[in-house]
Structures are given as structure tokens and as C-alpha cells.
Amino acid sequence: MVASIMLVFQLGLLLCLLLVCGLAPGFYCVRRLPWSPMEKLCGGAGLSLVLLYLAAWGIYCLSPRGAAGAAVQTGAFVVVSLICVWLGILARQDLSGLLRSPRVRRVVLGFAFLLLWTVVMLAMIRNYSGFGWFGDWLEHFQRSLFFLHRFPADTPIVMGYRLPARPPMMNVLVAFFLAQTQDRFELFQVASAFLNLLMFLPCCLMLPALGLARRPRILPLVALFAFSPVVMENATYTWTKSLSAFFVVLAFWFYLAGWRKNDRLRMAAAFLALSAGLLVHYSAGPYCLLLGLHYLLRVFWKRPRKWRELAAIVVPCALLLATWFAWSIAVYGPSVTFQSSTSVTFARQYQGNNLAKIGANLFDSIVPYVLRSGLTYSGQLNPAGVLRDNVFGFYQVNLIFGMGLAGGPLVLWLLWGFIRRHSARAREWPFWRLLIPCCIIVGVAVVGERDPFGSAHLTLIPLEVLGLSLIAAAFPWRRVAAIAVVAGCLVDFSLGVFLQARVEALANTPRRTVFAAGLNLRSGSLQPTHNSLSGMAWQNWYSVHRFALSRQYLGSLAGYLPPDPADRQAASRAQAQLRRVLDEDARYWQGWWQRHDYTLAFLGDDVAGESGDGAVVPQFELVILFLALMGALLREMRPAPPRRLPQRPPSRRSRR
């Protein structure tokens, strides 16, 4: 009971820190700029994250190092948070003025609803799984602990990576918040979900720029995000692609606005956002390349004071990127820094023709695997697992249906309409007609491996959420389109969101066994003895329980003395293997598992309880939220009643 109360308190403190530190410092800096309220909201959030990263990274690099596994100086992080609170107090009148904007209020309420929706989903999840996805969620937790607990530089990362294989910004940000609460995985989940949901803000900012409605509404975009399997999976799965997409979409807005208004500050903000996105995830690289080329070839030579603007772009971006790359080169060397990413390592391992690989990956990212080759992951005891994995592959790794069953085709239809007719925004739509295919081709080209299931989830998430924004900008939809979108949302939520969370809620209870592992004496390894879902789902479960299971079987073997010498040798080898597994806690995690009693708990585990009965509550809540949101969307789709003009009384003719 005390632990549950402490977790609730820590979650409340975490949300307060996320709200204050995620907006106040950046908004204080931009509050007096001649920007729109939405630009101040989104730009303030983006700049706040950059400033927090710089502060946390400076603390990590400059504070005195203690023993491996010791937490970074918490007091320094508290000071940074207090400064954020102070800046928020100084800007309170401007914040009040910002919230007086009706559009900002609707966006803030929409984000709050999406955060509630996502936390309810996290309260369901007890084991990450889906298709062939494995381990990334645990890897990013270890990376955050790396910066929080000052792991030695030579600490290996799970999945066989080195630290420079992925950029650090989101992991450093999460470490900043964990340092002021606790290094629990449940808090890591909520902090990651909050940061990943931020991409909703620049998508709302982009709505007017899409040119389909003079006053675009926010509710349709809220519904499309909540019902999107891709958005919700990337929000609940604790990796970093969605936060990178936040910076990329924000950069698109500031780039177009700076180009249209000849505004040097907005143009510099666009490339600073791209640099931040690259520090979150290298999937922002294609967008940095293409926007940089477009600026140099199409925009730069026509800009007033172009060299001063170029300096205003290059210097801040170079300084921001140097915080990571200069440090990594100094610690790991240039070879590890630039050649340990998955794009480089997988490209080296691929033996075939690169052009053929790019073409095949592009085709497979457009045509779903289930339509090309039939069902996969079919050898599962649970039919819901088979359906979930095939639906997961249909949505998550596909460029078209990643925007929804009906949303993807509708986006293609809307884009085709813009191509056919001359748009009023003649300056911007040619930009999109060029950028979209280039981003798709380059985004697939940088994928190192050959993936027959599709590669859209690696680099194309910014385009997918912009596609959802395009659908929302077209609201109110025509009758046929409205029926298709609503029906598609029902299918997307049922099969892509709710079913996914429902299968991820499956875990062992006193009345049901979903996963189990037994010791193979000959190999000395733990192997599945019962698995209701796919092999990858079992691997994700095993990665959480491997230390506890190793301790359990090591204790069982302590008194095991078989009469057969061969069996004794096998038992001795098994004990040695189990000890090697336990030694990985010190090697990879610097004793984190031991300090936490070899237990990693999901937020869904805390809600479900030991009996598992509590798991029903968030499922019921998610259905209620779905009905409420769908009802609000249907009410929004009703045609407005005609306004009745006041009738003038008949004029009296004067009698003569």
C-alpha cells in the first residue's frame, strides 16, 4: 500500500515537472517574439527541451564522477527545475495571455486528452510485444540509466550496441526527470509517453498551412491520433522516434513560415529544430539533408542578407550537434561514433545489390506483407495473438496503412487532388510535391537491412503524422469520406489499438500461465516451456524475468547432487551459465537489477496487482474514452443549422 501511494506521488511529481520544465524556459525566451500564439506554444516547448538537454548534458559532463552506478547529482537537477519554475512565474502574464487564445486552449485540452488516453493504455500493458519487435524498449531504459547513474563509458548496451549507435537527447531528458523522482520503469514509461506525444502540437500548428480549411478544427486530429495504431504504438513503446518527429514537423512549419515571410529567426529555428531531432534519433537525418539542400539550392540565393542568415543557422546548429558528436569522438573515437549506427552496421552486413534492396524495401513498405504472402506468426496457441501480429504488421511498418485503414487511401486521394488542380498556395504545394517523394525514397534508402515486412516505421513517421494532419485539415469531410473515415477509425481502434494493448496486457496470474521458462541442463540455458503468443513475445517477457529465473534455478541447483557423473557435470555447467547471466547485471546495468530486487515492473503490473484482477479496469476506461471521443467526433460532423437572420418588421406606409 505504501509503495502504491509513493508511486502515485512520484507520477504526480513527474507530470508537474514535465509540464513546467517542458514549456516554461522556452516560452520565457519566445514570449515577446512577433509569433502567433500557436508558434509560441510549439516553439516554446521545442526550445525548452533543447535548453533542458543542454543543462542536463552539462551536468553529466561537468559534475564530479562518483562510483559506477551512483546517481548524478540530484541537487543540480532540482536547481534547474527551480529555475524553470521561476521563469514560469516571471512569464505568468504571458502564459495567461497565451491560454486566452481559443485555438491554444483547444490544443492544450486535446493534448491533455491524448495523455490521459495513453496513460490508460500504459496501465493495461504488462509486456511489450508485436510482430518481430524486441528489446528496443529495454535498450532505451538502459541508455537513460547510463546517463542517470554515470555508467562507465565502456559499458555495453543490450542488443549488442555501443552507446554512440543512437543519439542521446531523449535519454538524457528522461534521466533528468528520473533523477528527481526515482529510477523506476513505470516512471520511465510515463515520461517517454509524454515526450512522444508532443508531436501532436506541431501537427496542430501545421493545420492552417495545409490549405484545406480556413479555420481547421482540433477535435478531428485528436481522434485520428487516438485511433491511430502507429501513433499509439510509438507513444507507448519507450523509444525515441516520435519525439524526433516532433522536431521534424516543427521544422517544416518554421521553414515554410520563414521562407514565406523572409524571417531569419524562423528559418534559424527550423534548422535548430532539425538538429535537435537528429540528436533524438538519426531518422531525422533524411529531413536534415533534404531541407538543407532545398534551402541552399532554392531559397538561399534569394534571401536578403543571406550570409548573415546562413551564419545564424550554422553556428547554433553546429554548437548543439557538437555537444554530442564532439564528446563521442573524444570518448569513443570517430570510427565508433559514425559507424556504429544500425544503418551503417546493417548495410555492411548486407551482401546484395543496394539499389535492389532499396527498391524491394520501398515496395514492401507500400504493399502490406499480409496481402503479398498471407498470414505470418500463425503458430501461436492464442488466436488473438495471431490476429494481433498480422494486424500489427499491416499498420506499423506500412507507409500507406500506417495512416489508417481508410486514412491512408484518403491521404492519397487528397494529394492527388492537389496535384491535379492549381492550389492557392502555389509557393508551398510545389515544395510538398517535391519533398514527399524525396523523403520517402531517401528515408527508405538509409535503411541498412533488407526487411521483407516493410521499413516505414524507421524514418517515415513524420510523413505519416502529417498525413493524419492533412485528413484533419480537410474536415468537415464529404459524406462518403466521412463514412469511410469513421468506419476506418472503428477498425483501427478495435484491431490496431485496443487489441494490441489487450494482448500486451496478457501476463501470468495465479489462475493463468501465459509464459513460462525451464532450465535445460545440457545447454545450461533457460528455454520456453509454455508460450501462448509468438517467440518474440516470449523473448520480451524473458528479458524482464531472466535474472529472477536465473536466481530461482541457481538456488534449486544448490542442493542438486545426482549420482550420475555426467548429470553432475551438466548441473555444474548450468550453474556456471546461470552465474554468467547474473553477472550481466553488473556488466550491463551496474547493479540496477540487484538494487531493485531483480524486478522490473510495468505500470500495468502495478494496476493489475498480484491477482491480475485490476487489469480489467483500464480496459473498461479505454472503451469509455473511445465512446466519448467517437461521440464528440460524430457531433462535430453534424452540419451546422442554418443561421436565422433577424427579420425586419414590415415598413408602414404613411397615409396621406
What are these regions (language model features)?
Residues 1-105, 397, 581-640, 655-656:
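Membrane-embedded, hydrophobic transmembrane alpha-helices
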Residues 24-31, 296, 379-428, 467-470, ...:
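Hydrophobic, aromatic-rich transmembrane alpha-helices
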Residues 24-28, 80-93, 186-212, 250:
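Transmembrane-helix motifs of polytopic, lipid-linked glycan transferases
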Residues 60, 222, 266-282, 288-292:
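Membrane-interface alpha helices of multi-pass inner-membrane proteins
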Residues 110-111, 272, 292-293, 314-318, ...:
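Signature aromatic-anchored transmembrane alpha helix within multi-pass, membrane-resident enzymes
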Residues 230-244, 282:
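Short acidic/glycine- and proline-prone juxtamembrane loop motifs at membrane-interface regions
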Residues 254-257, 261-265, 287-318, 326:
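Perimembrane helix-loop-helix junctions
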Residues 309-392:
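Membrane-lumen/periplasm interface segments of specific transmembrane helices
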